[in-house]
Amino acid sequence: MSSSNDQHLRSLGPVTRRRFIVASGALLAAAGLAPRLGSSAQDATPAASPTAPLPTMPPEITEYANDWPTPQGNLKNQRAASNSSIDSSSVTSLDVAWTFPIKATSGYGGMTCTPIIAGDTVYVQDMLSNVFAIKRDTGELVWEADYNSSCEGPNGVALGYGMIYGSTGDAREVFALDAATGKEVWKTLLSGNTREGIDMAPNVYGGMVLISTVPGNSQAFYDGGARGTLFGLDAATGEILWQFATVDENLWGNPSINSGGGSWYPPAIDDDGNLYWDIANPAPFQPVEVDGTPITLGSTFDDALYTDCLVSLEPDGTLRWYYAANPHDIFDHDLQQSPVLATIDNNGSPYTVALSSGKLGKVIAVETTTGHMIWTAKVGEHTQWDDAQWIPPGQSVTVAPGVAGGVESPIAYADGTVYVPILNLPVTFNDKGLDASTLSFNDATGELTALDVMDGSVKWDVKLPAGNVSAATVSNDVVFAGALDGIVRAYSTNDGTLLWSYDTGVGLNAPFAVAGDLLVVPAAGAKLVSKSYAPEATPVATSDAGAALIGFKVSS
């Protein structure tokens, strides 16, 4: 069935900027907490009950818990395999078992998604929004669902309630496919604004599909009036149950110029069904004049909520709290990754934190009940201008992290350690904006950094010769990383020692997945050019070989 946007899209009023404490003053005073918090029950449309009651937990997430049943491995987004035979003693025996060619092409490669592994099947989506079900053991095609709609990525699919859920990128639709056959069950248009798109994999929980729009698509990004919005859809029918506006409809007084917000990666979900989303940046970044008069940009608006915020929502989409990680963002320093939920044992009193990260080059631990920041760790290269709120007239400054840099792909967590993939690519800004000629992915380097979840201190750090943009993926005492040089690398979780590597021959620009004795690597063939900032920028030098999904297995 199909759900029309006119029928289901509900209007939201301006985002409320009132700030108030979500716990009693006595409780916060006793704990010594003083977070920057905000909440309003009016920030989301009221939720309706799903048409057909579905179990809270999608059965597949429990049934395939030992595989890789969600985009980030589990609903806490920890990116750690739960029952894999791949460890430091077997990783050197990994060998290519099969390859599955991907024909789609884009400036970001043929794929940017994390594969889903569930039972006998691997599910992936290419950069034209097409979905493939592949036999886990042989790499043979089971079914294919074609949409041929461009996207910027990262995209991807989610599994639940007998269906595969995904989106059509530029077409701004969410769809549900029968997981066994690939036949479309429903499709819903999220936005009638052609300046917006969808560039993320959803998560599925509580009878809902959780997904977001972003302020752009493959044609252009950050055009005036483009906004990111979070959605909860009925997983059975596609009906929009609630939506949460991540930016004010009035866009800080200049809707013809400003844009921003939305999410690029799926939210984390706690045991109570609360949602944790990282929200992207405001725009534009360059000075703008209207009729000769400088205007206030979204990126220079001091309270440009909820951009660059960690936002926690109730299951029905109402706001619990937010943490503003990067107000007054003039460098596109998103807080755009999937938050990761982890437990800290504070002298026998454990509490949960959401680990947020993004292009600002920081990992931030935020307590999930109150929204109080516990610690912040800078990672990768930083210059003195990284937190600047203005650039002196006539000056040019080097900014690191750059507009494409910092934590560009998802982090992982296991056994008290946070694993952070890093892209180092400084750029030059002046008082007129970004100097696009300095954005060259050929000059990028990478790192993989291990942090102690207790306090954010560095346990170890290793350097990579190219940008590390394929996330971090943990299997027992091994952590995998992939870089733009096309090499898959496996490191010891203990000290960062390199254990194994494999040259795929193409740029790696998508996260891996691990299940049992299988490592699945999307060899995307990336030739990165950041069209959003600099169409003339130098692409990363990679092979002309096409993209492929590669299945590695431990050889006997």
Segments from the language model and where they lie:
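N-terminal secretory signal peptides
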Residues: M1-T16, A23-P35, S40
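Beta-propeller domains
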Residues: S89, M127-G139
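Aromatic (tryptophan-biased) beta-strands that constitute blades/sheets of beta-rich domains
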Residues: P50-G107, E140-Y147, K183-G192, E239-D248, ...
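C-terminal segment of N-terminal export signals and the immediately downstream linker at the start
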Residues: G13-P14, P35-A65
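Repeat-blade elements of multi-bladed beta-propeller folds
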Residues: A65-L75, G107-N130, S149-V174, G197-D223, ...
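Secondary-structure transition into beta-strands, especially the periplasmic turns and strand N-termini
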Residues: T45, D234-T237, D272-G273, N346-P350, ...
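Conserved blade-register residue in beta-propeller folds
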Residues: A133, A176, G232, S312, ...
